[in-house]
Amino acid sequence: MTNPITDLANSDCILVIGSNFAENHPIVARWVMDARQRGATLMVADPRYTATAWASDIFLPLMPGSDISLLNSIMHVIVKEKLYNRQFLEAHTTGFDDLCSAVENYPPGRAAKLTGVSEDKIARAARAYANAPASSIVYCMGVTQHVSGTQTVIACADLALLCGQVGRPGTGVNPLRGQDNVQGACDMGALPNVYPAYQSISDPANRSKFAAAWNIPVDTLSPNSGLTLVEMTHAIERNEMHGMLIMGENPIVGDPNSNRVRGSLEKIDFLAVIDIFMTETAQLADVILPAASFAERRGSKTTTDRRVQWLERAIQPIGESHPDWQIVCGLAGRLGLRDAFNYDTEDGILDEIRRVAPSYAGISAGRLQNTIGGIHWPCPTDDHPGTPILYTNGFNKVDGRGVMKPVEHIESAEPTSPEYPLVLTSGRVVLHYNSGSMTRRSPALLKREPEMFIQINPETAREYGLVTGGLAQVTTRRGSLQAVVRVSLRIPPGVLFMPYHFPTMNQLTIDALDPTARIPEYKVAACRIEPLGEKERAA
């Protein structure tokens, strides 16, 4: 996030796209509601009329995968009506003319056909965002989990730059991470193409720097990008990968095209899993290493708004469980790599982070333990207060200017067809979390949300002979599953919604990837649906 979560309370207009934070990030919702009570305009772009949309002033009910067309059309209106921030553009950006040429092709009339959002709502959203003194954009995985995800994020940044809505309180482009400490994991280099602090592995100077820090020969560090998890399962199929260590992940439930994932993990020569539960994935493992829960470990965590905080354990690890870092260091020692993993404490790990990650250089364990609310990176020195708001004095370019990059509408990987005429999209519900490894073990939560369901519009339900409480079968090119029907006006005709917290849902999703970020397209799959008779239900 360019701005802290708490700073959302200072916004005069908030455009939410691809996020249902009322259910999925309820703490974020608190600060947004503070802004609303102060008179801010809340606009929500989502295929479903979610709990977040319910609270909005302007609801933009777009079809799944049409986000770029909506954003480009909003910018079209802003350019046509000259609502952009000319002074900011001239002083702080490049690429304005190219952007204007691109968005010229997205008048509200055309965008309405591509997105399903009315011309009037597009124009109202554009004026509200551009005219507000401080406007913020908030997005989540409803934006990124598409083959067009990277391009959509660029469009969000273009919109913010166009109106000068960045670098000030209440403004910015603010992605919400999908789970606890994902920001911290990425900051630490848990990505296939960067070292900690997003330092590229292709840069020889970076490889030399980290080889020295880790006490290893520089030629052991590859300049080539590694694989994402989806790409790893494909590599197993090609016999290019023979062993895997999975930490705190349940890909058999959580990854797209999960039947294919299961086939790969059943085929691999060796599988080790580090987890606190016997997940569906752990059941396939050759070795299971019991991890400590959050209450049994200590160390730093980084939240979605770059806020680094210190966590102390509540109890000692139970049984044979250990914190993840101790397990990894133990494995490294057995593999003859002890010199590269010579950590004795969590504080010592953070000391190394400070040495190799410039954005963390001023963040010590001692400072965190004595700082209520944490410290926002970048924090380059011990006496630096941290940086809650980014880009207050320009951008990270040689000329200090933000670059506007026009993007075009990109079709989803799997369009509908006569055989698969409906669009399936997936997401979360308030009572469960990710693959359900934790929440499906809670009797109280299961009592309220016990099973998979299919949300469907009344018009589509009538067309296919479906009623609330009935059982239906949903089929895609990758598999079929049965679930209970919930007829609802909260979803548009032609679209089905299913939560992904249950073991079978991702049998249906497609593992097509965004070509840049290599994130799979969970949010769009072509499908069909049919009611099941009594005999089929009994079976």
Label each PLM-derived region with a short phrase.
Residues 83-119, 196-221, 315-387, 424, ...:
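N-terminal leader/propeptide and maturation segments of large enzyme subunits in energy/redox metabolism
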Residues 129-234, 305, 339, 380-385, ...:
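A glycine-rich, hydrophobic/aromatic-adjacent loop/helix-cap motif
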Residues 318-320, 324-372, 435, 440-455, ...:
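Long, contiguous, secondary-structure-rich segments that constitute the structural scaffold
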Residues 35-41, 266-270:
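A short helix->loop->beta-strand "cap" motif at the edges of active sites that frequently abuts
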Residues 176, 183-192, 213-214, 348-444:
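Long, low-complexity segments enriched in small/aliphatic residues
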